[in-house]
Curated annotation (Swiss-Prot):
Gene Ontology molecular function, alphabetical: MAP kinase serine/threonine phosphatase activity; metal ion binding; protein serine/threonine phosphatase activity
Record's keyword terms, sorted: Hydrolase, Magnesium, Manganese, Metal-binding, Protein phosphatase, Stress response
Boundaries of every PPM-type phosphatase domain copy: 71-323
Name under which the protein is recorded: Protein phosphatase 2C homolog 1
Sites where the protein binds Mn(2+) 1: 109-110
E.C. no: 3.1.3.16
Entry function: Serine and threonine phosphatase. Has a specialized role in the heat shock response. May be responsible for the dephosphorylation of hsp90.
Ranges where the record places region Disordered: 1-41
Gene Ontology CC entries for this record: cytoplasm; cytosol; nucleus
Quaternary state and interactors: Monomer.
Binding residue positions for Mn(2+) 2: 109, 275, 314
Reaction equation(s) it catalyzes: O-phospho-L-seryl-[protein] + H2O = L-seryl-[protein] + phosphate; O-phospho-L-threonyl-[protein] + H2O = L-threonyl-[protein] + phosphate
Organism per entry: Schizosaccharomyces pombe (strain 972 / ATCC 24843) (Fission yeast)
Amino acid sequence: MKGSHPNAGSLLEPLHKLNPFSENSTSGHRKNASDHSADGETRPIAIEMKDSKGNTVPVGNSRPSKASNWLAGLMEDKNQRWRRSMEDTHICLYDFGGNQDDGFVAVYDGHAGIQASDYCQKNLHKVLLEKVRNEPDRLVTDLMDETFVEVNSKIAKATHNDICGCTAAVAFFRYEKNRTRRVLYTANAGDARIVLCRDGKAIRLSYDHKGSDANESRRVTQLGGLMVQNRINGVLAVTRALGDTYLKELVSAHPFTTETRIWNGHDEFFIIACDGLWDVVSDQEAVDFVRNFVSPREAAVRLVEFALKRLSTDNITCIVVNLTRNPGDLDDSGLTADNDSYSNDYY
């Protein structure tokens, strides 16, 4: 993993040095009209896109196949007691880029509207995929950084809104070196978080970019901004995000990135969720909680219910990704692709 945390442990292999402060997309379309076969069996929906050269290329599948060796489960809740609208979006793709068992999972937490998070949900993975295809020899973490910056530059024009923004937590994992090793790449901007379970221990793979963080507060003030009650100019609580064009000189789109080798038998799952969960549940609490469940779907559902009981006041989106899948595991993920934005239609 690029970088380390105090509880990282000896299995965290440093692959590259970590810097914690470190064109026109086209809509994807589904290759198949239905995800059910004639006998009623649920099957993956293949998602494709046009690349910058006009070629049709695979993006991934909306559901796992019987051969998939990982499985994700989702739960989202508007938290209507405190919120009038749902501004979170997410995406989960199996066989990302047409490569068996590669995956892309992301959560986007919008603020001042859903437009920025919706744009990221529909486009960020495609921008990253094209960069990985076109520049296979470059560090993936560098490509993720460039992807965040590029997507950020397009949000205001695409949404006709310079106030909306979103935090982002992105995970891309794949097999490398002729499938002799598996690597998890992550990037986040803002306070959406990614936590890996390794031998039962919580390993945080993200950084909370908040006004309350001394490093981030210092960065903002050095750029001429004011921190008022841990908010940029008294307005925005996160210091890194996508969008927020009206604060573009102060709010950075450059993500915190990590690169972690996945060790079979040690790395069980990771949790990717917005701050609606993490505001009331610690990393280790979440890991301990999820380990009580075999199904990632049930784990995600129960974890969100737990956060609501702890009086979370925000929208909550939580995805639990089991890095190994036992034969016979059902696709009970709660993830669907009933529309081209792959979300908001689960129940």
